[in-house]
Amino acid sequence: MKKRIVAAAVLIPLLLLLTLVAPEWIAAVVMSILLSIGTYEMLYKTGLVRRSRLILYAMVMAFAVAMWSYFDAMDAYLMLLLLVYTALLFSEMMMDHVKVRIEMLALCYVSGFVVPFLMGSLIRILGMTNGRHVILIPFVVAFMSDSGAYFAGLKFGKHKLAPVVSPNKTIEGALGGLAAAMVGMLIYALVLDLGFPRMQVNYGFALLYGLCGALAGMFGDLCFSIIKRQTGIKDYGNLIPGHGGVLDRFDSLMMVAPLMEALLLLAPMVM
């Protein structure tokens, strides 16, 4: 617990500095590097893919996909990236079809393209018109949901939510996470409303963000938990003391970030 608190005390200021102060290109590069590390964790740390070239291709692809989000590039560039990536992966399979299985390529697609594209929503949100004002929304939702679920589960948890996938999660904890995320978004909306009087803030949409985001975060958490369960590992890495690896700390954001991006475009909380 002490390591977790110390790590959080360091990470939170760094997060605020990165998202609110640092130039957008620096934030994009740092996020892209973290996604590349997360790709390595999913492939190598799980033991599912140990072929060095496949891991290298996936890590480079993860970085490139994330940076594509920053440059707001044409879809044609993403298509070319995917084309080259696909060719490289299947070339590896053709050179050694006995050891390189289709399951390995499928995981390379998920870790090298799908996850970075979804998590790249953070970079795309930062690039929006009110990006500096709304970039913290995915983090607020994920943090409040995780914290609310933890403390509510600790205090009131009796009924298991997903005993096979994640035995420690409870229905009571999930409800606490939903409530905490909604309260957190109301507070965040109030801060924006008071801090930026010219900005129009929709409190109803803030509640919607909290509710939907918390549900998405819990699902994202379970997605990465089932991979750890199947591969028999406790953590994806040890990059962050007390928290594990990149995927251990930011697992819920895989679902929260793209959902928040979609909601910000379809039902803007701030104008």
Model-inferred region functions:
Residues 212-217:
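Transmembrane alpha-helix interface/packing and boundary motifs in multi-pass membrane proteins
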Residues 262-271:
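Juxtamembrane boundary at the C-terminal end of a transmembrane helix
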Residues 229-252:
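Interfacial loop-to-transmembrane junctions
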Residues 1-211:
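Membrane-embedded alpha-helical bundles of polytopic integral membrane proteins
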Residues 256-257:
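C-terminal-most transmembrane helix of multi-pass membrane proteins
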